[in-house]
């Protein structure tokens, strides 16, 4: 659902920032 999508987006952003 929307919340799962949001979690995925946030996880991707955090992953990118953690390079």
From Swiss-Prot:
InterPro entries per the UniProt record, alphabetical: Aurein_antimicrobial_peptide
Subcellular compartments: Secreted
Coiled coil stretches, renumbered: none
GO terms of biological process kind: defense response to bacterium
Keyword vocabulary terms for this entry: Amphibian defense peptide, Antibiotic, Antimicrobial, Secreted
Presence of keyword Transmembrane: no
One protein family per Pfam: Antimicrobial20
Tissues with expression: Expressed by the skin dorsal glands.
Ubl conjugation found in the keyword field: no
SS bonds (residue pairs): none
GO cellular component: extracellular region
Described purpose of this protein according to its UniProt entry: Shows a weak antibacterial activity against B.cereus, E.coli, L.mesenteriodes, L.innocua, M.luteus, P.haemolytica, S.aureus and S.uberis.
Protein name: Uperin-2.4
Organism field: Uperoleia inundata
């Amino acid at each position: 659902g929307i919340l799962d999508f949001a979690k995925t987006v946030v996880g991707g952003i955090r992953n990118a920032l953690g390079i």
